[in-house]
């Protein structure tokens, strides 16, 4: 039997150690054992991870050599940080690592970096330009939301054309960065609109989604304040959390029967939404799914639904009546809280659970209110 040499053994041990915990999360244990430098920046005990910077950090800061991971939210809202030097040892930049660094004007991503996390540079509004080096193989959702400076992408794993970032096959739309465009036609062949792809595109009024798209990610169109017209094709099967959240001028939506999953807050705070058709295939309505849709006066809940989530329709102050289908067994906490115009509700015998304040501030006739109290107790009215 041939045994490894000492040098081979040492290298193997180092390689194994390298892969032990290269997560971008700063764990509680790591933070408890952290080494803090003179600027209030916390590093992991072994020096491989930059865990957390003080929000008081200002001016220029140089990350220590040997750091491999810049953790999630490491420089979160360090609003006085103006310049950052990242060493060539860094391979991963975590989720929201530089989110809210509004004074940051100068940063160079070294060509050692292979992964950039969700919203890594979100709200870096003073950053005039950013270069994605050719070493980057992984961009988690849209790293550049509300970061409107110039972008240059050298990585062969992505395509950046006309201020729109795609994966190399152009099957995923990652970041739409043309902030002045009022309408956009997503190219045929795109199958996925990733998390945050169109987030905060405040001038965008209409988007055409092709039949090739099957999924709309979390926050995909969130805070597109001017978006008033969108057609979801019947190829789409899932709509992510807060996918259309805060689309204040979105007036009507038809969700096709192909959709089986609607995420939490998917249409929350769509204040102008007055017309909504839900698909027959969905089994649950998520938490906050249509919360604060103030103009929504009627909705038909399909018979396939078995549960209505917490705050699902809370604040829908124009909603006048609702019929809960026979298949529903549970209605979440504050599900219809603040539906001031709601005067009629039909709750089937199959409902076994109604959360606290589910119908708080609903103006039911007294006889209906007493009937519901006798069935479910006073807690459902807060």
Predicted regions and their residues:
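Structural signature of tandem-repeat unit edges
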Residues: 1-2, 8, 22-42, 48, ...
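Consensus positions within tandem repeat domains that build extended binding/scaffold surfaces
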Residues: 72-73, 94-97, 117-120, 141-143, ...
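Active-site beta-strand termini and strand-to-loop segments that position acidic
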Residues: 167
């Amino acid at each position: 039997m041939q045994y490894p040499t000492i040098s081979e053994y040492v290298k193997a041990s180092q390689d194994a150690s390298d892969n032990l915990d290269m997560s971008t999360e700063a764990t509680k244990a790591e933070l408890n054992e952290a080494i803090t430098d003179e600027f209030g920046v916390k590093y992991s005990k072994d020096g491989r991870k930059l865990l957390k910077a003080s929000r008081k950090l200002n001016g220029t800061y140089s990350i220590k050599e040997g750091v491999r991971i810049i953790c999630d939210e490491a420089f979160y809202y360090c609003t006085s940080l103006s310049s950052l030097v990242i060493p060539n040892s860094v391979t991963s930049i975590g989720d929201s690592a530089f989110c809210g660094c509004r004074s940051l004007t100068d940063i160079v991503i070294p060509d050692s970096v292979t992964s950039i996390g969700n919203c890594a540079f979100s709200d870096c509004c003073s950053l005039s330009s950013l270069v994605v080096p050719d070493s980057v193989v992984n961009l988690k959702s849209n790293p550049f939301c509300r970061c409107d400076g110039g972008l240059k992408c050298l990585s062969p794993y992505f395509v950046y054309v006309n201020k729109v970032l795609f994966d190399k096959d152009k099957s995923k739309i990652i970041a739409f960065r043309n902030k002045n465009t009022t309408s956009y036609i997503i190219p045929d062949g795109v199958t996925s609109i990733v998390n945050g792809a169109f987030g905060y595109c405040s001038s965008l009024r209409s988007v055409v989604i092709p039949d090739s798209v099957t999924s709309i990610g979390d926050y995909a169109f969130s805070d597109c304040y001017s978006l008033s017209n969108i057609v979801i094709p019947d190829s789409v099967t899932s709509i992510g959390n807060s996918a259309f959240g805060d689309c204040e001028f979105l007036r009507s939506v038809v969700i096709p029967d192909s959709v089986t999953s609607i995420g939490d807050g998917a249409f929350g705070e769509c204040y102008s939404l007055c017309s909504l058709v839900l698909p027959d295939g969905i089994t649950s309505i998520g938490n906050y799914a249509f919360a604060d849709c103030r103009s929504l006066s009627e909705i038909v809940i399909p018979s396939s639904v078995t549960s209505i989530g917490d705050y699902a329709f809370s604040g829908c102050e124009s909603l006048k009546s609702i019929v809960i289908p026979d298949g529903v067994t549970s209605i979440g906490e504050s599900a219809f809280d603040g539906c001031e115009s709601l005067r009629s509700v039909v709750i089937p015998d199959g409902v076994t659970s109604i959360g606290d304040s589910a119908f708080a501030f609903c103006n039911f006739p007294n006889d209906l209110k007493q009937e519901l109290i006798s069935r479910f107790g006073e807690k459902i009215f807060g």
